[in-house]
């Protein structure tokens, strides 16, 4: 996955009703009318998701039909991904793994959903996502969603996240980790992480490369990293985000 370079815990004793955190500039995220604040990392704002998008039907890795509305009452950490990404998404999985562990340690797993929604609905079927989730050892509150191309497009248009299908370089045809077949295309996409409040509103976002802060990529995906992915792991760059940034946005 060759990325677009630009986009637009509840861990204390008390679960705060209003999420706060700390800002990255770019095209994804709230409109100017949202008047977001911009502390140290990420952008804090409050934006309702379109009612039409909130009821769009997705399918999770267990084959269950889901909607964003069905997650109301939960705090949701949302990001875009594809299971065949070799550069950024495996690192995102590493940070999500850290977040899941911190949420569990704080005893609030029942109140937090980690949600990855594909930008590659043609290949990321529920069956593939089931295997992907199992290989990651993802806990029950770490969900993977797919849907029709129209549903996926509507969600990411609402969130301001761009993606596009591109052909693979004929000389660099990577192998599908599940089927063992050479891949014929990739999906470029922006790398954005959102927090949705229990009211279903967007509350916070950040962007850039995941910084694992010395942590590891899940074993299942280590071997799938390409040269760019290994370089991103070693040196995420200035514009990056950590699991601590996200957990700070959940307090």
What positions do the PLM features span?
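N-terminal "domain-start" segment that seeds a small globular fold
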Residues: 35-69, 94, 101
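Bacterial N-terminal signal peptides that target proteins for export
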Residues: 1-11
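Thiol/selenol-based redox catalytic cores and closely related redox-interacting motifs
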Residues: 141-142, 146-228, 232
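Short, small/polar residue-rich loop motifs at catalytic or cofactor-binding pockets
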Residues: 51-53, 75, 187-190
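Structural microenvironment flanking redox-active thiols in thiol-disulfide oxidoreductases
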Residues: 93-155
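C-terminal motif of bacterial Sec signal peptides marking the signal peptidase cleavage site
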Residues: 17-21
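Bacterial signal peptide processing site
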Residues: 23-26
């Amino acid at each position: 996955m060759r990325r677009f370079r630009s986009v637009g815990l509840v861990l204390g004793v008390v679960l705060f009703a209003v999420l706060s955190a700390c800002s990255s500039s770019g095209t994804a995220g709230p409109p100017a009318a949202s008047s977001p604040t911009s502390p140290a990392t990420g952008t804090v704002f409050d934006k309702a998701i379109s009612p039409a998008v909130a009821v769009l039907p997705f399918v999770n890795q267990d084959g269950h039909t889901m909607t964003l509305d069905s997650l109301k009452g939960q705090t949701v950490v949302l990001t875009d991904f594809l299971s065949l990404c070799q550069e950024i998404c495996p690192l995102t999985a590493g940070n999500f793994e850290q977040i899941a562990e911190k949420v569990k340690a704080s005893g609030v797993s029942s109140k937090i959903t980690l949600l990855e929604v594909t930008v590659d609905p043609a290949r990321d079927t529920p069956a593939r996502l089931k295997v992907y989730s199992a290989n990651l050892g993802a806990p029950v509150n770490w969900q993977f969603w797919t849907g029709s191309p129209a549903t996926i497009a509507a969600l990411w248009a609402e969130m301001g996240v761009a993606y596009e299908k591109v052909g693979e370089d004929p000389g660099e045809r990577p192998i599908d980790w599940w089927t063992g077949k050479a891949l014929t295309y990739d999906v470029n996409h922006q790398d954005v992480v959102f927090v949705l409040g229990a009211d279903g509103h967007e509350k916070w976002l950040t962007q850039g490369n995941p910084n694992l802060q010395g942590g590891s990529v899940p074993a299942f995906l280590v071997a799938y990293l390409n040269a760019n992915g290994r370089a991103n792991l070693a040196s995420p760059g200035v514009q990056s985000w950590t699991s601590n940034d996200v957990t700070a946005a959940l307090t």
